[in-house]
Amino acid sequence: MKKKFFLAGVILSALLLILVESNPNKRVRMKEVRQFTETMCRSDEHIKDLKFYFQRPGLRAEMVYEGPLEKEKLISITEDFKALVDVEFMQKIGDNYWGGARPSGFELYIYCDRDKEGNNYDYLIDSRYNKTYIVDENPDNIDGYKTWTISGAENEGVLYKD
């Protein structure tokens, strides 16, 4: 009888470990992120939700925004995120969530007037460490999260690039 309980416990523990480790998203819970999220939500009543996730090999944020988003507001949101996401910040993310490896990119998915469902986002704001998809430390290939792109969903293409 004891062997059956022990075996059931081992199997249950293994299943739990598989479920926990197979989740590709790890919720980011750092002081800087918490303060940034609180500031963003307080400064704009239309921001209903903002969460950050580490999703190897990058950092992902998801925002639920109530109401229409004009290009100027999208650029303003981008500027706010530019102030947070830099090489130093992304290295902290890597140190805390990926054994010291710096995330290769940042993506902000914005969902307007609805809860997020799958990848049915309305806007995507992103930035990368490297200029190309080749991940290396060649100085000619390093952008350091300085270039930001705003894209629309449904093949709308690039709306803004800074």
Name the predicted role of every residue range:
Residues 41-68:
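Short edge beta-strands and adjacent turn/loop segments
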Residues 94-162:
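Polar/charged, Gly/Pro-rich intrinsically disordered segments
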Residues 1-11:
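N-terminal Sec-pathway targeting helices
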Residues 62-120:
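Mature extracytoplasmic domains of secretory-pathway proteins
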Residues 9-19:
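Hydrophobic membrane-insertion alpha-helices, especially the h-region
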Residues 37-40, 80:
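Short amphipathic alpha-helical segments
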Residues 21-35:
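Bacterial Sec signal peptide processing site at the extreme N-terminus
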Residues 32-33, 37, 85-89:
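Hydrophobic face of amphipathic alpha-helices
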